[in-house]
């Protein structure tokens, strides 16, 4: 089941501590205005995968850019993702894209703000993304919005 988390009271936020990509980002920032956490979980005590999403009208090049959210967002930015079970990160991205398209009709672009690591590169390219832009410290991968892949 897909969960979109936008408030600090949700039990799945206890698992933010496991974020291997951007552990320095505080939990309250992840669910503040223009941001949310999406989780794939059958219950609130056992997530399969989690991703943090920020909404913008541009493609951010660095973590500091995540502070600038849009009133009418056109771009969903996946800025950290991790999974507890094989294949569930991919499943979460597909379901999150579909859910965001339904709940945020102004969003028509799906990109990442990924670290420059081989693991991130393999994950996103294997799951159908293209490299949109290489930045100083990050890479923006872009997903096809028609299929969610």
Identify the meaning behind each predicted range.
Residues 1-31:
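Short amphipathic alpha-helix that is part of the acyltransferase structural core
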Residues 26-49, 54-57:
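A short helix-loop-beta-strand connector motif used in the catalytic cores of GNAT acetyltransferases and
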Residues 39, 47, 96-107, 111-115:
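Preference for well-ordered, secondary-structure-rich cores of eukaryotic proteins
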Residues 52-76:
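Conserved acyl-donor/pantetheine-binding loop and adjacent beta-alpha core of acyl/acetyltransferases
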Residues 83, 110-122, 137:
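Conserved beta-strand-loop-alpha-helix junction that forms the acyl-donor binding cleft
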Residues 83-102:
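Conserved acetyl-CoA-binding loop-helix of GNAT-fold acetyltransferases
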Residues 125-135:
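Conserved acetyl-CoA-binding loop of GNAT-fold acetyltransferases
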Residues 136-149:
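C-terminal "cap" of GNAT-fold acetyltransferases
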């Amino acid at each position: 089941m897909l969960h979109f988390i936008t408030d600090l009271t949700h039990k799945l936020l206890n698992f933010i501590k496991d974020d291997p990509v951007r552990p320095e980002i505080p939990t309250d920032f992840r669910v503040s205005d223009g941001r949310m956490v999406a989780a794939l979980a059958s219950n609130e005590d056992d997530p399969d995968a989690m991703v943090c999403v920020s909404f913008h009208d541009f493609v951010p090049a660095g973590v500091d850019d995540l502070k600038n959210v849009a009133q009418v967002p056109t771009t969903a930015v996946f800025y950290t993702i991790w999974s507890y079970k094989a294949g569930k990160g991919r499943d979460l991205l597909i379901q999150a894209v579909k859910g965001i398209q339904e709940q945020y009709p102004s969003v028509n672009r799906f990109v990442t703000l990924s670290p420059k690591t081989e693991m991130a590169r393999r994950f996103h390219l294997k799951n159908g993304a293209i490299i949109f832009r290489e930045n100083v410290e990050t890479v923006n991968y872009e997903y096809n919005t028609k299929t969610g892949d």
